[in-house]
Structure formats: C-alpha cells, structure tokens
Amino acid sequence: MDDKQIVIIGGGLQGLATANALLDRGESVIVLEKEEDIAQAASFANAGILTPSHSMPWNSPSDILKILSGIGKKDSPMVLSPKAIPSLFFWGLKFLRNSTNKRFLGISKNCIDLANYSRSLTQEIRAKEGFEYDNAENGTLKIFRSQEALDKAVKISKVLTPTAEIDILDSQGISLAEPELATVANQLVGGIYYPDDEIGDAYKFCKLLEELVRSKGGRILVNTEIKKILINKGKVNGVITDRAILQTKRVVVAAGSWSHALLKHVGLKLPVRPVKGYSLTLDTAGLSSKPKLAVIDDSIHTAVTPLGNRIRIAGTAEFTGFNHDFHPKRAAYLNNTLKAIYPNLYSQLDLEEGRLWYGFRPMSADGLPFLGQTKLEGLFINSGQGHLGWTLAMGSAALVADIITNKSPDIDPNPYLAGRSL
C-alpha cells in the first residue's frame, strides 16, 4: 500500500463522507470497517431526519434534569444506568460544565451553523449524483403537550435562528400540516413546523456513498478490524489490522463511539461516550393514508419518520455504556409512542413484523463534534456528532478534508477542532 494513501477507520456516515470529500480534493483513501457491511452502527436505522433548523445538543438545563430523573428507569426517555456512572464520571463532569444556559445556547448556534452548511452539501451531492434514499424535503413538525414547553421552544428558536422560517401552529394548524395527526390534535397545545428540514434513510445514503467512493478509486475493506494505530516519535506511520499491517502517514478516526478506545491506545483522551438509542421500523406499503412529515415529540426525545413505504419510530437516550441488552420495556415504549401519536396508523400495522434496532450515538461532552488534527502528526478525528450524526455528516467531512489538505474551509472550523479544551 502507498503510504500517501489516507486510512479512514470507520465505514459509517462520517467515514464514508470523509472518504468522498478527500477523493474530491485529489487524495487517495482506504476505508476500514470492522463489520460485514458498511453503516452497521449508529448510521443503520437512526431517526432519518436532518434538522438544521433545531440542531441542539442534549445538554440543556432541562435535559440534565431529565437524565437525572431517569436514573435506573428503563421506561424513561432518558436513562442513566447506575452501573455506568463510574465510567462516565469525568466525562459527565465536562458534560455538566457545558450545560449552563449560556453554554447551551452558544453550542447550539455552532451546531446550527455546521448543520446548515452540511445541508447545503447534502443537497449538492444529491443533485449532482441523483441520489435517492427515501428522501423528502418537506420539513419536520415538532409537537408539544404543554404551553410552557411550546413557549420555551419558540423563544429558543427566535434566539438561535432569528432569520429562519418557522410556522407556529395551533391544534388546527397541526391537523392541516399533518392530517394523520387530526385524531390527537386536541391533546396537543401546538407545534412548530420547520420547512427547511429533510428526511432520508441514512443507511441507503451510505450505500450510495460507498458506490460513489469506489467509483472514484477509493478502497473500502469490510470485515477488517483495527488492532492498533502505529505511532513513532509523535507521528503516524501505520495501522495494524486483523489482516495486515498498512503503512500510512495519515489516519482519520471516524469510528463513532469506538473512537474513544482507539485514541486511548495512542495516549489521547477523547471525551466521547456512547449514548444508546432505539428504533422500530414498520412496513406501511398498501396503506391508503399515511404520514408525510417527520414528527418529533420533544417531551420524550422521540421522532416518527415516514421513509418511503416504511415508518420509523426512533429515540430515547440511554447513558449505559456499551450495553447490548434489548430491554422489553424499550420495545413497548416505541410501540406506545407510535400509538399515542398515530392511533389510527398503529391499528393498521403488523407490529409482529416490525424491525427493532439499537445503536450507540457518539456523544461529546460539550455537544459538538471533534474534527481535524490531533496533537499527533498525521492523526485526525471525525467523531462526536451524537444524535446529530446524519444532520452534520457532510459538513463535518468537508471540514476534516479541508484541514487535512490545507484548504481554506467554507465555515469557521474553530468551534469543532479536535484539539479544543473542554
């Protein structure tokens, strides 16, 4: 292997988008993925929404209260496992430090800037390559069950995105925006419609990226596990996989929640930890009437998204480390969420055929991704997007590729730099 080739660790959204961005800048790349197929972790069956209009981290003061109130509760939208507290202690202190209202608003603005940039790049590649991935550009609808929550969300939107187009809806407006909500609209105090948001299947997008990367000369190796990143005198000089030793002077770690462990072996502390999320995907083919908008119930951090002839219920946040158990209460929670939002649809679906899934979101301690150069020469990071991985993917990749190739970025990369201090 030519040591000028850049090794990208991770074949999910971040890794594949980075590979494509580097190829467009004239670089040679090889993507290494430990699973049998690309995009098998957080990219596989996520909520399927791109939300530049309200890309906010999960470290608001109110979210902190939800997390603390969910300690040990499997039926809570946000769960903190007592067993995971020791491993999350120092990360948690940094998370709390960034949860003041001032920090939350500042970080949210940074997220929204990157999200808007990312959306433009997503639209660009879709138009150029003719990508189709059950995508729709018809916005998202956030619903509220209390006036206080709605008022707070409207206020935050006006502060963070004063020029963005949003529609504040009453219960009648909700029914007009999404007719399938008509039966529950009287239970809602209102909603916010964000016309600039999009939906799409992240896994299908990744498969299209995979094909595109290969067509441009990039290599993608699946079933290839990284054992070690080789460092000599503060510089990258290769990686050891379970297949071979690859010589390279540049490595991008885009391994999601597993990035922390890979970097720990080379003496770097990355404040990114896994936050477990769940989804349930059901077939809606043949139904005469079905939802057209992604609907987000902000009170429980859950979204219901139409993706072609499927509907996906996704959400919840478990701070449990790499816990691979699928608790029955989570399946019931997702079913009950669908029933509460779309009772008519719920009664028509074959729940036995639904596909349950969980993944680990790579959550940074401050809510922003870590992008670019580390203190080790030739070692770069693209990780920490958390629940905004789909929303931030193309923009994150472009910034990392610009940093690697010394190209002037289109937006300020400083808030997201890998070497920032928390």
Q: Across the structure, where does each feature detected by a protein language model lie?
A:
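C-terminal lid/capping helical subdomain adjacent to the catalytic/cofactor pocket in oxidative enzymes
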Residues: 4, 181, 231, 368-422
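N-terminal Rossmann-like FAD-binding beta1-loop-alpha1 element of flavoenzymes
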Residues: 4-31
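Dinucleotide-binding Rossmann-like beta1-alpha1 core, especially the glycine-rich loop
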Residues: 45-172
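Helical element adjacent to the flavin cofactor pocket in flavoenzyme catalytic cores
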Residues: 151-161, 184-242, 246-249
